[in-house]
Amino acid sequence: MASTIFVLNGPNLNALGKREPGIYGGKTLADIEAMCKAEAKLLGFDIDFRQSNHEGTLVDWLHEAGEKSVGIAINPAAYGHTSIAMHDAIRAITVPVVELHLSNIHAREEFRHKSMIAPAVKGVICGFGAQSYILALHALKNLTEKSK
């Protein structure tokens, strides 16, 4: 059985494809999940892909992923700018975590420029639309190979 990467998605990402496609693109979260699963198969990983609009649920999943996966890709969405709880949960995890965003958070409103979780993760990928997820999977592949 292949090693598992968790792909966690924060609030409002369930509305992708309908919500501000000029910023987030036209792909739905189901489209992105299918892309991730196909790419992960090529990389030799299984994917556990989840989305929640609730911060506490995401924190619980981070703890679970820290125990059950070889790496985590997380699109925290708006919680990336506000969640000390997610920052602290990531600090407690020993597997690599990559933060990703569909849009370039640094080219948007000033309140989106700072990520509360960026100091706790291995790296941040933003601004490449749905491709940000694929780049995160490749980063995790590289990070897990380095740790062997």
UniProtKB/Swiss-Prot annotation:
NCBIfam families xref list: aroQ, PRK05395.1-2, PRK05395.1-3, PRK05395.1-4
Superkingdom classification of source: Bacteria
Lineage: Bacteria, Pseudomonadati, Pseudomonadota, Alphaproteobacteria, Hyphomicrobiales
Catalytic activity, as annotated: 3-dehydroquinate = 3-dehydroshikimate + H2O
The protein's Enzyme Commission number: 4.2.1.10
UniProt gene name: aroQ
Organism: Sinorhizobium medicae (strain WSM419)
Subunit structure: Homododecamer.
Family note: Belongs to the type-II 3-dehydroquinase family.
Keywords associated with the record: Amino-acid biosynthesis, Aromatic amino acid biosynthesis, Lyase
BP GO annotations: amino acid biosynthetic process; aromatic amino acid family biosynthetic process; chorismate biosynthetic process; quinate catabolic process
Function: Catalyzes a trans-dehydration via an enolate intermediate.
Marked site positions, Transition state stabilizer: R19
GO molecular function, one term: 3-dehydroquinate dehydratase activity
Identification of the protein by name: 3-dehydroquinate dehydratase
One Pfam short name: DHquinase_II
